[in-house]
Amino acid sequence: MYRNRIKRLLDILLSACGILCLSWLLLLLAVAIKLDSPGPVFFRQKRVGIGKRHFQILKFRTMRIDTPHDMPTHLLHDPEQYITRMGRFLRKTSLDELPQLWNILVGDMAVIGPRPALWNQYDLLAERDKYGANDVRPGLTGWAQIHGRDELEIAEKAKLDGWYVEHISFGLDVKCFF
């Protein structure tokens, strides 16, 4: 019951409340991004959602517009050269993730779940298939993120995502959230 209906209802409530309560901050950050560097306020990127369905993830733009597009930041040669001043602040505080509240509201994502893989991260997607981790909505944060984020090897990240999927519960989501 929790996994299907209650979790989705909580996602809708939390994301709607988040958008409403933080609208002033979202607007302030959007203006700051525009003043800091040329280009759009938002960064959109093709990601993989539930059942390997593609969707466009929404984030505040933290990098220059000439940055290679479909590559994780940690794989770029000298990624610091691409990050804007405002981007450094947004990444350090994780405020660049706030626009994903929209992705949660419309059902592309959940508040808690495996982080959505890039469409071209075939190795991660294949590894997650072993554990059923592609069969749930991806999350803003998740079990693997609180255990190491990008520092984890793909096999370990997929295993942690699979453990989460196997043990989804309100209590586990609360533990991941806080």
Regions found by a protein language model. Give the residues of each.
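Hydrophobic structural segments characteristic of membrane proteins
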Residues: P40, P99-F178
